[in-house]
Amino acid sequence: MAAKPFFRRRKVCPFSGENAPKIDYKDTRLLQRYISERGKIVPSRITAVSAKKQRELARAIKRARFLALLPYAVK
């Protein structure tokens, strides 16, 4: 009898749905969840964010960095 292949459950985008949070450059607490300890933007394959929302998220993070709400790099 062969073993069943391992099935990894597909993650759902945290920004899709009715009561999903809006991506806003002023919401630094939300944006910090999608930045690594070194200050880099975490890729969507790890965070399970859809491609469209990942672009919005990256734009919001870059805007917040430009306005000095978020750091560019962490020491």
From Swiss-Prot:
Top-rank taxon, per record: Bacteria
PROSITE patterns registered for this protein in UniProt: RIBOSOMAL_S18
GO MF term set: small ribosomal subunit rRNA binding; structural constituent of ribosome
GO cellular component, one term: cytosolic small ribosomal subunit
One Gene Ontology biological process: translation
Pfam families (UniProt xref): Ribosomal_S18
UniProt keywords, alphabetically: Ribonucleoprotein, Ribosomal protein, RNA-binding, rRNA-binding
Function: Binds as a heterodimer with protein bS6 to the central domain of the 16S rRNA, where it helps stabilize the platform of the 30S subunit.
Family: Belongs to the bacterial ribosomal protein bS18 family.
Subunit structure: Part of the 30S ribosomal subunit. Forms a tight heterodimer with protein bS6.
Protein name: Small ribosomal subunit protein bS18
Organism: Ruegeria sp. (strain TM1040) (Silicibacter sp.)
Lineage: Bacteria, Pseudomonadati, Pseudomonadota, Alphaproteobacteria, Rhodobacterales
Gene: rpsR
